[in-house]
């Protein structure tokens, strides 16, 4: 039987309560899972989403960034982070992460659309963030154009 202090058990219980909408239970369980295993990026992802859904986008942003260090090509994480940034009014950042989400989902049409929107707002974005997106987009576009 699994131990109640097993970080996987805590993460899954936290995710269960998050999905049910019981954010206070999810909060405690996910924080406990992250304390025991700080590298459990799935616990951090659910925690970021829980923070985001409870109006704490600034805190959520730190966790989304941490998760992306572990799984930089995860389309779902980029999409969730984009939606969170959109709630704060950071349209440039939101479009950058929506473009990544489309790139990593291999959705050429959406990637082009979001990349162009990010490019139009690039003056308001972190220049390094946009340059990284531009490089990833060009690399993926070359592959798409060959096929």
Please provide the spans of the model-predicted regions.
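Canonical tetratricopeptide repeat
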Residues: 12, 46-47, 80-81, 97, ...
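Terminal, low-structured helical/coil segments at or just beyond the last alpha-helical repeat
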Residues: 104-147
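Canonical positions in the second alpha-helix
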Residues: 32-33, 66-67, 101, 117-118
């Amino acid at each position: 039987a699994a131990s109640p202090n097993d970080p996987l058990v805590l993460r899954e219980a936290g995710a269960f309560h998050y999905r049910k909408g019981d954010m206070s239970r999810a909060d405690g369980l996910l924080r406990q899972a992250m304390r025991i295993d700080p590298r459990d990026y799935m616990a951090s992802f659910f925690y970021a989403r829980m923070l985001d859904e409870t109006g704490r986008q600034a805190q959520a942003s730190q966790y989304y960034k941490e998760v992306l260090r572990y799984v930089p090509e995860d389309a779902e994480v980029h999409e969730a982070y984009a939606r969170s940034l959109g709630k704060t009014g950071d349209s440039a950042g939101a479009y950058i992460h929506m473009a990544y989400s489309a790139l990593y989902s291999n959705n050429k049409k959406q990637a082009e659309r979001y990349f162009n929107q990010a490019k139009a707002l690039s003056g308001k974005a972190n220049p390094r963030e946009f340059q990284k997106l531009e490089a990833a987009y060009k690399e993926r576009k070359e592959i798409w154009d060959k096929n």
